[in-house]
């Protein structure tokens, strides 16, 4: 056993939690001593949980009032606040997401610490239960051998040595020593009830801890999923995802406060036990085990007297006396009564087995083994266990703050998306620079489709037979352009009018270029006149 663990000293956070006021539901001060069967003490733990529940109610009331005010407030100058609101929503979502991730990280550590502490507690309880069960098994086995097996051998030897009074007297003395051994073994504590209680406590604690650990693990995963889906909803500007995550955020907020209430009351009750665990154990076992025995195992000091020393000493002396008697009978009686050798050797083997059991009982009854299990159980639950519960409480508090900010930010994001859609829908559909009109024009073009030029290259004769109609000059583009120019206070420039529909080439062409241009446009003029009507 490590020297640092010889004496148990409760950590400072245990005293910090233990010094909290213990008030019952009638607001009266109660003793902080751990007594889970006392209704008054149960009310003190319930009062702590109700304080946390009151904080949760205030938090939910604040969120509700904020959401109602946000929905009912009149729209002010949105154009001035839209950019600020969008930036605020972004930063709030980012901070709440980081806070939630930090809370989940702290929660993972706290959950692991609590699980380690409870595992160490159950492991120590199992070891102590194994020790006590071993003592009971050895004591019952030795008692059975002394009562049943030894009596059978002595009965047959009495018949063999009936003619020798001195040998019969030795057998009676051995019977008396066996009675002393049985009496001393009976005086030892009966650990059967205690071992059963330890086994039940270890099994129930292990089962509860497994479901607690699994529940927190699922809670961590759900919190991370809510944060990720909320970020996806904000990135994709999805109102449906934001609405769903708003509902899940409220549920997560209530779960955070609920877990905080459970963790606070559990940590406070465990701290009350860890401040004075020996006092509680002595009160619980006073009707099963003597106070001297419990005190011997709880403190295990060299200055304390071993309460089993006298019984074990009598046991050892009685065995030694019986072995001396058997050795004498083997030496002097067997030559006279050869048939007695088998029973005497059987008694000798029984005494050797009983001596081996005595050494094992002495080792198991020593306080160092059970005291080590006791210290390890205390360190597991009072150090790792309570520390883990404090970290879980911090996780719940940070998660509650994160989801409060997230729930308050999502309606702002909703309003921002609604304002964006409303501004988008208010754009004039006839505006040629409207992005929506551009998309509609791209997907549903209204202009005529250009015919393939390959269809006109099938036969030159058919092209030659086509006579181009006389080009009709349309003044519609010119008039439209002039109207637009006059509207904006400018002078119309005919040079900027498109060349579609004009029969003459540009005035800047040279005569050679003009002749080339006319020769190239004579035949396909009918084609272009159909494709691009004037």
UniProtKB/Swiss-Prot annotation:
Using the UniProt record, give the first listed, main subcellular location: membrane
| GO BP annotation list | L-glutamate transmembrane transport
Residue intervals on the Cytoplasmic side: 66-87, 235-240, 410-534
Extracellular compartment residues: 1-44, 109-213, 262-388
Q: Which GO terms describe its molecular function?
A: calcium ion binding; volume-sensitive chloride channel activity
Q: List locations, semicolon-separated.
A: Cell membrane
A GO-annotated cellular component: plasma membrane
Protein name in UniProt: Protein tweety homolog 2
Q: Source organism lineage?
A: Eukaryota, Metazoa, Chordata, Craniata, Vertebrata
Gene that this sequence comes from: ttyh2
């Amino acid at each position: 056993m490590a020297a640092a663990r010889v004496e148990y000293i409760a950590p400072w956070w245990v005293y910090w939690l233990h010094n909290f006021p213990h008030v019952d539901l009638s607001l009266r001060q109660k003793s902080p001593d751990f007594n889970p069967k006392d209704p008054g003490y149960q009310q003190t733990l319930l009062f702590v949980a109700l304080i946390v529940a009151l904080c949760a109610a205030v938090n939910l009331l604040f969120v509700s009032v904020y959401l109602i005010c946000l929905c009912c407030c009149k729209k002010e100058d949105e154009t001035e606040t839209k950019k600020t609101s969008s930036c605020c929503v972004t930063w709030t979502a980012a901070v709440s997401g980081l806070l939630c991730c930090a809370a989940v990280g702290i929660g993972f550590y706290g959950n692991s610490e609590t699980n380690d502490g409870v595992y160490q507690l159950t492991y120590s309880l199992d070891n102590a239960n194994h020790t006590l069960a071993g003592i009971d098994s050895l004591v019952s086995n030795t008692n059975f051998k002394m009562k049943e097996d030894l009596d059978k051998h002595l009965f047959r030897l009495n018949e063999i040595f009936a003619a020798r009074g001195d040998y019969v007297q030795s057998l009676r003395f051995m019977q008396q020593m066996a009675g002393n051994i049985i009496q001393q073994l009976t005086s030892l504590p009966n650990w059967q009830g205690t071992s059963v209680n330890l086994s039940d406590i270890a099994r129930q604690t292990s089962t509860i801890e497994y479901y607690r650990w699994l529940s927190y693990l699922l809670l961590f995963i759900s919190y991370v999923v809510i944060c990720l889906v909320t970020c996806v909803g904000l990135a994709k500007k999805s109102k449906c995802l934001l609405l769903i995550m708003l509902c899940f955020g409220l549920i997560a907020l209530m779960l955070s406060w609920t877990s905080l209430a459970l963790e606070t009351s559990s940590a406070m009750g465990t701290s009350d036990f860890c401040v004075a665990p020996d006092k509680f154990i002595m009160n619980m076992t006073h009707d099963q085990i003597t106070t001297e025995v419990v005190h011997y195992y709880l403190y295990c000091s060299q200055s304390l007297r071993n309460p089993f020393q006298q019984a074990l000493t009598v046991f050892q002396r009685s065995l030694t006396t019986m072995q001396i008697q058997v050795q004498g009978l083997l030496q002097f009686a067997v030559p006279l009564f050869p048939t007695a050798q088998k029973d005497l050797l059987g008694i000798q083997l029984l005494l050797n087995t009983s001596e081996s059991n005595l050494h094992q009982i002495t080792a198991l009854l020593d306080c160092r083994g059970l005291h080590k299990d006791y210290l390890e159980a205390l360190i597991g639950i009072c150090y790792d266990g309570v520390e883990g519960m404090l970290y879980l409480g911090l996780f719940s508090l940070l998660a509650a703050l994160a989801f409060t900010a997230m729930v308050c930010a999502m309606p702002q994001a909703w309003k921002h998306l609604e304002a964006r859609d409303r501004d988008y829908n208010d754009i004039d559909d006839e505006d040629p620079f409207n992005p929506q009109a551009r998309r509609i024009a791209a997907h549903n073009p209204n202009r005529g489709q250009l015919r393939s030029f390959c269809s006109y290259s099938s036969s030159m004769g058919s092209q030659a037979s086509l006579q181009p109609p006389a080009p009709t000059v349309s003044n519609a583009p010119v008039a439209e352009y002039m109207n637009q120019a006059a509207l904006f206070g400018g002078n119309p420039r005919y040079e900027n009018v498109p060349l579609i529909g004009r029969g003459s080439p540009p005035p800047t062409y040279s005569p050679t270029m003009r002749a080339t241009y006319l020769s190239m446009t004579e035949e396909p003029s009918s084609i272009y006149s159909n494709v691009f009507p004037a």
